[in-house]
Swiss-Prot record:
This is GMP synthase [glutamine-hydrolyzing]. One of its GO terms (cellular component) is cytosol. InterPro entries: Class_I_gatase-like, GATASE, GMP_synth_C, GMP_synth_GATase, GMP_synthase, GMPS_ATP_PPase_dom, NAD/GMP_synthase, Rossmann-like_a/b/a_fold. Coiled coil: none annotated. PANTHER family: GMP SYNTHASE [GLUTAMINE-HYDROLYZING] (PTHR11922:SF2), GMP SYNTHASE-RELATED (PTHR11922). HAMAP family: GMP_synthase (MF_00344). Homodimer. Pfam families: GATase, GMP_synt_C, NAD_synthase. It comes from Vibrio cholerae serotype O1 (strain ATCC 39315 / El Tor Inaba N16961). Residues 200-392 form the GMPS ATP-PPase domain. NCBIfam families: guaA_Cterm (TIGR00884), guaA_Nterm (TIGR00888), PRK00074.1 (NF000848). It catalyses: XMP + L-glutamine + ATP + H2O = GMP + L-glutamate + AMP + diphosphate + 2 H(+).
Length: 517
């Protein structure tokens, strides 16, 4: 490796916008390493990070309010280029001598920005740009040493710049796809203004991760809880590439997986890629622990607790293992970082081996902790994992445990597995699978009357669920063709003995959540 992929870096200060992680993903997409920190970071931390440029994100607060967030003064004393986006532009203007006021007309949605003058930010772009606005306040006076470089009909200062100091501000969101040339603007800032090189690529990330794993664990043995999900699968491939047979994967079949999933995991990682895998058939143990429990959070906790017990027992048999590999990714790290003002993301309890007992006394190997999910998928492809595995729809950590409503029983799981497999198979056959963001089947523990032949029968009900979403924070139910839904329903009722009725969930998020439990 000729250059350290972390040598050139952008710091993004988070003021709370729903799009902030998207800014970071775009910078990574450009090929430059970046980190996302809360706006109230200490000067010493910025100095130590030593960024080549700083981006101030958007945010929900109003600069006109007392005690609203401000960028640390060091941002403007550091001598590095600064790019303020939406709220970031407003706080930049206010802090450097301009003025912000609440607008008479709020601007949400598409707008056209007329570019004026020549700016490095808009290099090689047309003089009219389609952009995405989302603001109630606006800059009404720019700082004395700034010039206007863009305006809309309702926003006189849609973009401003101090070319000498390399300070830029835009009132719109260049990070969203609705801003047609937003990525080019970010490229102009990151590559052009900040002078960064494209060192952050899938190949270089793999090379760096493998080198770091080797350095961290030396000749020690490592264990990994392999679920067959994207994160743990990519960790398995990376660690195996680094240390080969010194990695042992523990695959716990809890009886709550999709149809044939256990066999597929063993076949892919054991037979095809040659990893050491211990398969633990723990279906009976999990179902026994879940007996009589019908409350969703209690089910989650029970599944998590039993997984930890099983994994702990298996790890004790591997007495030489000194390291535990985990699939922690960058959004987990961001969510776990508490801001000193309490405004940062709260810690989320993830269903993974993060809850393992303290007495395991193992070091952690987390090769994905700098990566976003889309980056994890890209390096998974580079490592040889199949596309359809890396890009399949999300599956909850507790598995069918939260897709069987109420108490979980083997009979219910077996019926649900088969019904769900039919739904997914038909989505692929109709070329609809990649057109929806997530699709699955839910088992309802209620019997409904049906007619089969000359007789009536009371059998179970399942619900099909398919949604379209960009970020999973909000979602629309997918308008699947009636003919398609009819075909899926007929197949399930005819092929899965025990199901007499199929319904389709047409609830959006909000008010409903995507999963039923």
């Amino acid at each position: 490796m000729t250059k350290n992929i972390h040598d050139q870096r952008i710091l993004i200060l988070d003021f709370g916008s729903q799009y902030t992680q998207l800014v970071a993903r775009r910078v990574r997409e450009i090929g430059v390493y970046c980190e996302l920190w809360s706006w109230d970071v200490e000067e010493a931390d910025i100095r130590e990070f030593n960024p080549d440029g700083i981006i101030l994100s958007g945010g929900p607060e109003s600069v006109t309010e007392a005690n609203s967030p401000r960028a640390p003064q060091y941002v403007f004393d550091s001598g590095v280029p600064v790019f303020g986006v939406c709220y970031g532009m407003q706080t930049m203007a206010e802090q450097l001598g301009g003025r912000v006021a609440t607008s008479d007309e709020r601007e949400f949605g598409y707008a056209q920005v007329k570019i004026s003058g020549e700016s490095a930010l808009f290099k090689d772009l047309d003089l009219t740009q389609d952009v995405w606005m989302s603001h109630g306040d606006k800059v009404v006076e720019i700082p004395a040493d700034f010039v206007k470089i863009g305006e809309t009909d309702t926003c006189p200062y849609a973009a401003m710049a101090n070319e000498e100091k390399k300070y830029y501000g835009v009132q719109f969101h260049p990070e969203v796809t609705h801003t047609k040339n937003g990525l080019q603007m970010l490229e102009n800032f990151v590559l052009g203004v900040c002078g960064c090189e494209r060192l952050w690529t899938s190949e270089s990330i793999i090379e760096d991760a493998v080198a770091r794993i080797k350095e961290q664990v030396g000749n020690d043995e490592v264990i990994l809880g392999l679920s067959g999900g994207v994160d743990s699968s990519v960790v398995a491939m990376l660690v195996h590439r680094a240390i080969g047979s010194k990695l042992t994967c523990v695959f716990v079949d809890n009886g709550l997986l999709r149809l044939n999933e256990g066999e597929q995991v063993m076949e892919m990682f054991g037979d095809k890629f040659g990893l050491n895998i211990i398969k633990v058939d723990a279906e009976e143990r999990f179902l026994k622990a879940l007996e009589g429990i019908d409350e969703p959070e209690a089910k989650r906790k029970t599944i998590g607790r039993v997984f930890v017990e099983v994994f702990d027992e298996e790890s004790k048999k591997l007495s030489n293992a000194k390291w535990l590999a985990q699939g922690t990714i960058y959004p987990d790290v961001i969510e776990s970082a508490a801001s000193k003002t309490g405004k940062a993301h709260v810690i989320k309890s993830h269903h993974n081996v993060g809850g393992l007992p303290d007495d395991m006394k193992m070091g952690l190997v987390e090769p994905l902790r700098e990566l976003f999910k889309d980056e994890v998928r890209k390096i998974g492809l580079e490592l040889g994992l199949p596309y359809n595995m890396l890009y399949r729809h999300p599956f909850p950590g507790p598995g069918l445990g939260v897709r069987v409503l109420g108490e979980v029983k083997k009979e219910y799981c077996d019926l649900l597995r088969r019904a769900d497999a039919i739904f997914i198979e038909e989505l692929h056959a109709a070329d609809l699978y990649n057109k929806v963001s997530q699709a699955f089947t839910v088992f309802l523990p209620v019997r409904s009357v049906g007619v089969m032949g000359d007789g009536r029968k009371y059998d179970w009900v399942v619900s099909l669920r398919a949604v379209e979403t960009i970020d999973f924070m909000t979602a629309h139910w997918a308008h699947l063709p009636y003919e398609f839904l009819g075909k899926v329903s007929n197949r399930i009722i005819n092929e899965v003995n025990g199901i007499s009725r199929v319904v389709y969930d047409i609830s959006g998020k909000p008010p409903a959540t995507i999963e039923w439990e």
